[in-house]
Amino acid sequence: MKETVLQNYMQLKTEVYESIIPKNIEHAILSEANWLGRGNLMSGEDVGFFVEVGDIVYMDYGQAYLNEMGYQHFGLVMAISEKKALVIPMTSNAKTYANAYDPESNPEGKKNLFPLPGIIDGLCKKSVLFLNDMKFVNTARMIEKKAHIDVKSPVFRKIQLRIMMLLFQNPSVI
């Protein structure tokens, strides 16, 4: 029975990789390999990876549903709790950046998107945060630190305020 279950699973995986996600096959396989290698870790600390609030990390979000960040992307660490980090996924996609809300330059933009000002030291392109896709994840998903935003900086505080507005949709809460 166990052998049949395994064969059925492998056949299904093969079909999925060949048909449903052909454009993401490399990312999907890499994500699965990352999960196999790190999925049993309590945190990134188990492999010598220590993260701090404000770090921008390259990480593996794993498989995703539609409208969720998946596979390997950058993320901004907003908080740490019990070996898990609250991470906001980000992209350098120019079209997404152009659609992001900014009270001065794009007041009609999407409020779930937060454009980071300029190019952050350690990154190569302008980036935008997906505020409505933030989540707590095991820090073992994190592969490499790429940059850092000072938690006392005005930009970090603006991100925190926008999160509060997005979550509670009432500026008086802030």
Predicted regions and their residues:
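Conserved functional hotspots at enzyme active or ligand-binding sites that engage polyanionic ligands
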Residues: 1-174
